[in-house]
Amino acid sequence: MKVIAAFLLAKLGGNENPTSNDLKKILESVGAEIDETKIDLLFSLIKDHDVTELIAAGREKMSALSSGGPAVAMVAGGGGGGAASAAEPVAESKKKVEEVKDESSDDAGMMGLFD
């Protein structure tokens, strides 16, 4: 993620064709760890592609994701517990879903992108 951010910063700064040395300078300026393999991988994946096209394709893929939240598995009540024991797992799963929704609102839809 840091390598992509450095690449985009170089592009935003007016460098139309950033090099790996440009990315290293940006990463060094903020004290970030430099991973040569990730830099090389980025350049191999984006060669012959326009950044705006890549962003548009990513945006399209993100919009295709379900925004309904995480799937909750319903637990069926075991043997002789009756309706009371079956209702307990449902109540617990609803509580867990609410907790997950509260945590995800902090990310503002970024799904932990910068963790």
UniProtKB/Swiss-Prot annotation:
Residues 78-115 are annotated as: Disordered. The modification Phosphoserine is found at S104, S105. P1 and P2 exist as dimers at the large ribosomal subunit. This is Large ribosomal subunit protein P2x. Belongs to the eukaryotic ribosomal protein P1/P2 family. PANTHER family: 60S ACIDIC RIBOSOMAL PROTEIN FAMILY MEMBER (PTHR21141), LARGE RIBOSOMAL SUBUNIT PROTEIN P2X (PTHR21141:SF84). Residues 91-103 have a biased composition (Basic and acidic residues). One of its GO terms (biological process) is cytoplasmic translational elongation. Coiled coil: none annotated. Keywords: Phosphoprotein, Ribonucleoprotein, Ribosomal protein. It holds the Pfam family Ribosomal_60s.
